[in-house]
Amino acid sequence: MPVTSRPTTRVAAVDCGTNSIRLLVADVGPDGTLVEVDRRLQIVRLGQGVDRTGRLAPEALERTFAASREYARVIAETGATRVRFVATSATRDARNRAEFADGVRAAIGVEPEVASGDEEASLSFRGAVAGVAARHAGPYLVVDLGGGSTELVLGTTSPDVVLSLDVGSVRMTERHLHSDPPTPGEEDAARADVRAALDRAGEVVPFGRTVTLVGLAGSVTSATAHALGLSSYQRERVHGAVLGVEEVLAACDDLLHRSRARRLALGFMHPGRADVIGAGVLVWSEVVARVRADVAAEGRELTQVVTSESDILDGIALSLA
């Protein structure tokens, strides 16, 4: 009797974060293969002011609903049969998230899920490891550096330790980096905040076990594009890029100390990221330095960092197979 293979499923995944909302339409096979059909990003800054007010701002909600309506059109045109909408840090923290849910439901026709920090981290790990496991050994420390939070996941084939930290590019900008470019005092305060968070994280996540450090999301990919000297953003060059630790730290330092105008002059820089990238790369540089130090304390050396364009969005898509 001939063996028939199960067909692929066309799925649509939406990741609604603190700074951006992204869509991935893909064909997912029963073996976990993923073939991209359409991928989009819009900067909506949903988390605008949430760290201070505890609420999603009306103008931020409207930007997000408008993007959701556009994504609903793409989903219908591409014929996706399964849709999952996952919201993360900003929505978790907001007192008016029911208003957000009502607007998304009206715009896109599905119930938005507000992921816990642990679930967000697990989805990020699944997407990231699928993109790098063939070329790099575990254990992997996957770092998903978002606008409102940073997810840390340590594991090999599945997450062993998961932790979500309330440090991200938008949150740290609003808390500390008010000048353009940041003043030394603002930078020192931000670094102290991030280091305190990493000290707490180190009590839960054994950073020293890391064999491959994998960075995800816009702050990391922008720093990688800068380190590679790209004049325009090239996803195929950024995904899977392996950089020396010192290259990463130098690129982060340069981006942090540039003015917004000088960041915008970089051909790869998304206009909606230029004002928060300084805080994002500050967080990333502190994570890289901390992991390198803890690996060294275990008698090993961390010399390289991997960047993945496969992240929570891919993890959401894979969960729909």
Predicted segments, located by residue:
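N-terminal basic/disordered segments at the start of proteins
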Residues: 6-35
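A structural signal for short, well-ordered beta-strand segments
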Residues: 16, 40-42
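Structural motif
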Residues: 20-22, 149, 220
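Helical "lid/coupling" subdomains associated with nucleotide-phosphate turnover
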Residues: 6-11, 30, 44, 49-77, ...
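A generic, well-ordered mixed alpha/beta core segment in the N-terminal half of proteins
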Residues: 141-149, 153
